[in-house]
């Protein structure tokens, strides 16, 4: 079941986040699996599997196979495995959680499908969206962002630390996790509001164990 401590440092990634790796699709897949294991060994508190963008896998069978490998690693190290967006995949794999955005399946539908099976995270980009979600008991936490500019969400308006503050000040009690452009250097600004989710801060770090350690301790 859901424990808000798992939001402390969530690694979010798919094979597309290793575009800086030389080689083809399989090299990116292997880089993801190697990085995930290193990150789990270094004590990330959760992993969110996210296949999105031009370089993401397109074949559902390949996506499922990769998701299963990631899930196995999470089980080995006792970290929650969360599927981004793909509710059906989360159900098939009996994932621990599912995370959806405002443009994905309607949250009411996600709740109907996943309630009592997965914990549910919902992305919000405005205070209004957060206020709308506050009474949805089945939503375990809110993902807030992008806090800083980020290549993974080029089309999204940066919301800044201000939105985290507004949500907290509004009296919303749900746990929050900040995402978008978070690095070891700006993570300390966010800790008072809840957890942090990162992609490139781990995926592109030269020393991944050091990056995780710094993000955990700073944050």
From Swiss-Prot:
Positions annotated to bind 4-amino-2-methyl-5-(diphosphooxymethyl)pyrimidine: 48-52, 84, 123, 153
A Gene Ontology molecular function term of the record: thiamine-phosphate diphosphorylase activity
GO biological process entries: thiamine biosynthetic process; thiamine diphosphate biosynthetic process
Binding site for Mg(2+): 85, 104
Catalytic activity: 2-[(2R,5Z)-2-carboxy-4-methylthiazol-5(2H)-ylidene]ethyl phosphate + 4-amino-2-methyl-5-(diphosphooxymethyl)pyrimidine + 2 H(+) = thiamine phosphate + CO2 + diphosphate; 2-(2-carboxy-4-methylthiazol-5-yl)ethyl phosphate + 4-amino-2-methyl-5-(diphosphooxymethyl)pyrimidine + 2 H(+) = thiamine phosphate + CO2 + diphosphate; 4-methyl-5-(2-phosphooxyethyl)-thiazole + 4-amino-2-methyl-5-(diphosphooxymethyl)pyrimidine + H(+) = thiamine phosphate + diphosphate
Keywords: Magnesium, Metal-binding, Thiamine biosynthesis, Transferase
Binding-site residues for 2-[(2R,5Z)-2-carboxy-4-methylthiazol-5(2H)-ylidene]ethyl phosphate, renumbered to this chain: 150-152, 181, 199-200
Biochemical pathway: Cofactor biosynthesis; thiamine diphosphate biosynthesis; thiamine phosphate from 4-amino-2-methyl-5-diphosphomethylpyrimidine and 4-methyl-5-(2-phosphoethyl)-thiazole: step 1/1
Disulfide bonds: none
EC number: 2.5.1.3
Alphabetized InterPro entries for the sequence: Aldolase_TIM, ThiamineP_synth_sf, ThiamineP_synth_TenI, TMP_synthase
A GO cellular component entry from the record: cytoplasm
Co-factor: note: Binds 1 Mg(2+) ion per subunit.
Cofactor needs: Mg(2+)
HAMAP family: TMP_synthase
Role of this protein: Condenses 4-methyl-5-(beta-hydroxyethyl)thiazole monophosphate (THZ-P) and 2-methyl-4-amino-5-hydroxymethyl pyrimidine pyrophosphate (HMP-PP) to form thiamine monophosphate (TMP).
Family to which the UniProt record says this protein belongs: Belongs to the thiamine-phosphate synthase family.
Name listed for the protein in its UniProt record: Thiamine-phosphate synthase
């Amino acid at each position: 079941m859901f424990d808000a401590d798992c939001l402390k440092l969530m690694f979010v990634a798919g094979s597309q986040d290793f575009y800086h790796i030389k080689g083809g699709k399989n090299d990116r897949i292997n880089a993801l699996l190697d990085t995930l294991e290193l990150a789990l060994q270094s004590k990330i508190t959760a992993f969110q599997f996210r296949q999105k963008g031009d370089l993401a896998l397109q074949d559902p069978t390949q996506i499922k196979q990769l998701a299963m490998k990631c899930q196995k690693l999470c089980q080995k190290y006792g970290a929650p495995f969360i599927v981004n967006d793909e509710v059906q995949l989360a159900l098939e794999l009996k994932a621990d959680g599912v995370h959806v955005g405002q443009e994905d399946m309607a949250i009411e539908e996600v709740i109907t499908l996943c309630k009592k099976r997965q914990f549910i995270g919902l992305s919000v980009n405005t205070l209004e969206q957060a206020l709308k979600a506050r009474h949805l008991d089945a939503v375990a936490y809110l993902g807030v962002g992008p806090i800083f500019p980020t290549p993974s969400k080029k089309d999204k308006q940066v919301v800044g630390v201000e939105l985290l503050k507004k949500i907290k000040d509004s009296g919303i009690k749900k746990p929050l996790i900040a995402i978008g452009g978070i690095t070891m250097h700006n993570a300390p600004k966010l800790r008072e509001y809840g957890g942090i989710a990162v992609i490139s801060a781990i995926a592109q770090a030269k020393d991944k164990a050091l990056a995780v350690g710094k993000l955990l301790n700073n944050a």
